[in-house]
Amino acid sequence: SNGTFLNGTRIKRKTLSHGDLISIGSLTAKYVGTALEPLDTKGGFSFAANSINVSINEKVLLDDVSFAVNPRSLTAIIGPSGAGKSTLLNAITGRRIPNTGEVMIGERSLYENLSEFSTQIGLVPQSDLLHSGLRTKRALEYGASLRFPKDTNKDERAERVDEVLSELALSERADLRIDKLSGGQRKRTSVALELLTQPSLLFLD
């Protein structure tokens, strides 16, 4: 589930102090005085990788990689097989912390607030994580049951599933088994799975 985070740390109950940041899913607010002031994140987050270095057994996989991505934009990283694209993706999503370097989301460190930001990052892997024997809609409903907060009822989950099916032009394939979809349709279903929770950042390997 998304959980509630105070200054990047998951909490159940905590007394707030002036200036604290509290996040629930993609919603973030700042505690000022006796009130919570919502922070405007509808414009998306800026994203920057700074001097990312990854080495294994003295073999350099990533060497001083830096780049920035503007909010609400699309960036493609291309290269031949073995160039380090998946290694970079693992580093900039926090799946593997690099030897050195930093990733900033807005003005905050991904690695210092990993538990919080992991709920706001969608990652579509090379290999689909879908249950091939399930129908498309059922596979997404199952994914929603695992990813949504426990207090989300069945009707709310079903509504969100229908929304992403429509957004990705999969409504007519809702009752078709995953293993009967075309390759492109399966990949769109994998994207739909990640979009269920409306992540602020979406990565595709």
Residue ranges and their predicted role:
Residues F5-N57:
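C-terminal boundary/linker segments immediately following FHA domains
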Residues I78-S81:
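The feature captures the beta-strand-to-loop junction immediately N-terminal to the Walker
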Residues T93:
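Helix-to-loop junction immediately C-terminal to a conserved catalytic motif
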Residues G101-S109, F117:
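Conserved ABC transporter NBD signature motif
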Residues S132-P149:
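Q-loop/switch helix immediately C-terminal to the Walker
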Residues E141, S145, E156-R173:
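Conserved ABC ATPase "signature" region
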Residues E194-L195:
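ABC ATPase C-loop
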